[in-house]
Structure formats: structure tokens, C-alpha cells
A protein has these predicted regions:
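A non-catalytic alpha/beta surface segment that caps or lines the substrate-entry region
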Residues: 7, 11-53
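Catalytic-core environment of secreted peptidases
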Residues: 48-89
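Acidic/histidine-rich catalytic neighborhood of metal-dependent amide-processing enzymes
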Residues: 64, 85-162, 167-169
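Zn-dependent metallopeptidase/amidohydrolase metal-coordination segment
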Residues: 168-213
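His/Asp/Glu-rich mid-to-C-terminal helical/loop segments that flank catalytic regions of hydrolases
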Residues: 197-262
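Acidic, low-complexity, intrinsically disordered interaction modules
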Residues: 281-335
């Protein structure tokens, strides 16, 4: 059994989506959303559905191809799809991936029209009164199998979160989240949807790549996270080539990152903790990030605060080694000391 069969992918349903016009697809998606307990909002330029998982999924309904792909060729093992007219995987693959994802995760969903014309539908969405309250945004509109494209969003903690699921950061020019993310002030990423050679007649879709990324994203969406804010990538203005340059970007002060999320690993039970020459605390009370920084875990807040001046080692004096796959490793809200004290006081007064 291949991964698509194991995940219940319907090739016939996917092929029908590939053959629909943008208008037909929008009508079809309204029915699909209602079937899965959504109440879709259908407007000129976009289709939105509020979910219960604080993640916004985005894909676009149009393709650049002018001919309906009535002839679809499939490889013998069922993995690859092509059409002599251009199959339109950009972005029907992303649309179908969202339909599969919503079976397991009731995320917020946004389908945009006319992305290929410059994000027309996305701009109409940002001009509407809709403003979903989500922790981050995932678009499924990227070529390849393993890419994560953040465009002008520069939130290192969000990048680390996404890449901890095996995706690799890459660059890109534009997609609907380039418009939606800064509007919602929320970090966003464009993930590979398994298509290749987009905008060409010999475009190809790798259904195995689609299903593998559905599997990874399902695991991602089941992680409890805080809100990842949108942070604009900093560039110095001016260049001899007439473009913005990042040459002096390190000299520009970045926004404060006091309240953020970090991937933190529990320390092994045998770990010894020291402040100066004095042994302190116990390992279960502390967490470590991938840079080796230590944090005290605050169970009352289900959060952490950086433990300045504390270092950890085993009986032989060796520091613990960070592992993203270690049991108990997860993203936690990290507060400054002052924020932690304030929130503990609030929790005490509320009880």
C-alpha cells in the first residue's frame, strides 16, 4: 500500500478538481465545506470558512492554463499526473490538499481567486471585514516536495517551528500570503504542494509528495503554539542596482522578541544544574533550546522563562545534546522574568 492509498486520497476526485473551471470549483468547495461542518462565506474573489484550529490554510482556485485538462495521464504506479494541456497543479494540488487536511484538522480556510493575476482575491479578502484569529498561516502553493517559503516574513521562531517538521527554507517572489500575512499581522509560510514545471504544458504532479506533506502538516497543526507575529524582513534602502539591499540589515534594530515561542527539550533526569559552582534545582524543572540556552518550566502557566546564569551537564561534565524528536520536546511560550511574575500574579488572583 502506497502513502496515497494509506491516507485515503481519491485520485478520481482529484482529477475532477483538476478539470473544473474556477467558478465550478468554487461552487464545489462550498458543498465540500458544508459537508465537513463549516459555514462558508462566499464572496466575490474568495471563499472563507471559519474553523476551530487556530491555523489559516490558503490556496488559490485559478490556473494559468486556458484549456481544460480533459486528458490526464497517470504513471503506472499512480504517483505522477500530467496532461498535454497543462494539468494545473498550481494550485489545484494545494486545493485538494486542504480538502484532505480538513478531515483531520478543522482549520480556518481561505480559497482565493485570480492569484495568477496578482493576488486579486487575496486583496479582496483583506478589504473585507473578515479577520480570523489564528496563530499562523500556511499556504499550499509552492512547487516541489520540501520547500518552505516565508517571503518577507522574518520570524525566526516561526521558521524554526516549520522547519522542525522536515521542511527546508527556500525563497520565492509572491503568493497570496504576501498580501494576507501582513494584513493579519500573523506569520505565514508557503509549503510545497507537489507540482513541478508550473505554468508549462509539461507540468507534473507528484501525488506521493502531496500526501507526505499532508502527513507532516497534520502533525504540525496538532501542536499547541502561541501566536507567531508577522515581522517584516529588514532591508536597508538603496542600492546601486535600484533594489533594496540587506547589506546593512544587521545594523537595523529589530523588534523586541520578549514574548515568543521556542522549541524546548526536557532535560534528561540525570542532568546536573549549576549556577556558578553551586548545584541547584532538578532537571524536570528545566528545558533547553537548540542553542543550549536553559529555561525554567512554569507548570502553572504551561510556559517557560529563561534561566540566566544556569548551565547543565551530566556526571562527566558534558552538556546535554538537543534533540527535536526527544519525547516531550515541544513549543512553549517564553516570557521575560517580569512578564512571568505578572502572569503568575494574575493567575493567583483569578483562582
Amino acid at each position: 500500500m502506497n502513502i496515497c492509498e494509506a491516507m485515503g486520497m481519491s485520485i478520481s476526485h482529484f482529477e475532477s478538481i483538476l478539470k473544473m473551471t474556477q467558478r465550478e470549483l468554487k461552487e464545489h468547495l462550498v458543498q465540500q465545506l458544508r459537508t465537513h461542518d463549516y459555514e462558508p462565506v462566499c464572496k466575490s474573489g474568495f471563499l472563507y470558512a471559519e474553523g476551530t484550529v487556530p491555523v489559516l490554510l490558503v490556496a488559490h482556485l485559478d490556473t494559468v492554463h486556458t484549456h481544460r485538462p480533459d486528458i490526464i495521464c497517470c504513471s503506472e504506479d499512480g504517483r505522477y499526473l500530467m496532461s498535454p494541456y497543462g494539468i494545473g497543479g498550481d494550485d489545484r494540488a494545494g486545493v485538494y490538499m486542504i480538502l484532505m487536511l480538513m478531515r483531520e484538522c478543522h482549520c480556518h480556510i481561505l480559497f482565493c481567486e485570480d492569484e495568477e493575476l496578482g493576488g486579486v482575491g487575496a486583496r479582496k479578502f483583506t478589504n473585507s471585514k473578515l479577520r480570523p484569529d489564528v496563530n499562523y498561516i500556511v499556504e499550499l502553493d509552492r512547487r516541489g516536495r520540501n520547500d518552505a517559503v516565508f517571503y518577507h516574513c522574518d520570524n525566526p521562531d516561526f521558521t524554526e517551528f516549520v522547519c522542525s517538521f522536515g521542511f527546508k527554507e527556500n525563497s520565492g517572489s509572491f503568493s497570496d500570503i504576501s498580501v494576507v500575512a501582513p494584513h493579519l499581522k500573523t506569520a505565514a509560510v508557503n509549503i510545497s504542494a507537489g507540482y513541478f514545471n508550473e505554468h508549462r504544458p509539461h507540468e507534473m504532479i507528484d501525488t506521493y509528495a502531496m500526501c507526505e506533506n499532508i502527513r507532516r502538516l497534520t502533525a504540525m497543526f496538532r501542536q499547541n503554539t502561541c501566536h507567531f507575529p508577522y515581522k517584516e524582513r529588514v532591508h536597508a534602502r538603496g542600492s546601486m542596482f535600484g533594489e533594496q539591499s540587506s547589506l546593512f540589515a544587521p545594523m537595523v534594530e529589530r523588534p523586541s522578541r520578549a514574548a515568543t515561542c521556542k522549541l524546548l527539550m526536557p532535560l534528561p533526569e540525570e542532568t546536573r544544574l549549576y549556577m556558578g559552582q553551586h548545584q541547584i534545582g532538578s532537571a524536570p524543572e528545566y528545558r533547553m533550546d537548540r542553542s543550549g540556552n536553559l529555561y525554567m518550566y512554569l507548570e502553572r502557566l504551561n510556559a517557560a522563562v529563561e534561566a540566566e546564569g544556569v548551565f547543565a551537564c551530566d556526571a562527566g561534565g558534558h552538556p546535554p545534546v538537543f534533540s527535536a524528536v526527544c519525547e516531550g520536546t515541544r513549543f512553549l511560550q517564553v516570557y521575560t522574568y517580569e512578564e512571568a511574575v505578572e502572569k503568575l500574579e494574575q493567575a493567583k488572583n483569578a483562582s
